[in-house]
């Protein structure tokens, strides 16, 4: 069975990004997407789709096409409750609230990895122990928070 990956909004966003200010992240995202993605069972959520739709940026249609066919995880009342716990226990900020929802989705559905370029709120080593403590209290799995270059298979 392939490892599971929850793909957060920044991944398709960076894949489709045309700016030169994030060229390394864009390159690494495209490398992972084109070379590594098929070695994983990938998932997005309605939250990812809503964020992609709501944005005002060039390449929106390309981003939406990119995630077509990827399994969509449902945002349930339990997910929102978990996100609220993350906020109340100061693991995640209240704004943007979607960041805590992404983490709740990956935890609730037992994803092995949460793939993101959000290094401030998600792929941040300073949050790992806090996440482990909260998720153990809640009886949830603990996803590995990773960026695309951290999730490349090296032979």
Regions found by a protein language model. Give the residues of each.
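Acidic, PIN/NYN-like endoribonuclease modules and their adjacent C-terminal/linker elements
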Residues: 1-4, 18-20, 26-27, 109-155
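Short, well-structured N-terminal submotif of metal-dependent ribonuclease cores
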Residues: 1-44, 51-64, 70, 88-94, ...
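General small-molecule cofactor/ligand-binding pocket signal
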Residues: 43, 73, 146
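Residues at the C-termini of beta-strands that transition into short coil/loop
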Residues: 46, 76, 148-149
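Short leucine-rich amphipathic alpha-helices used at interfaces
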Residues: 57, 93, 99, 143-144, ...
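Surface-exposed charge patches
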Residues: 65, 104, 133
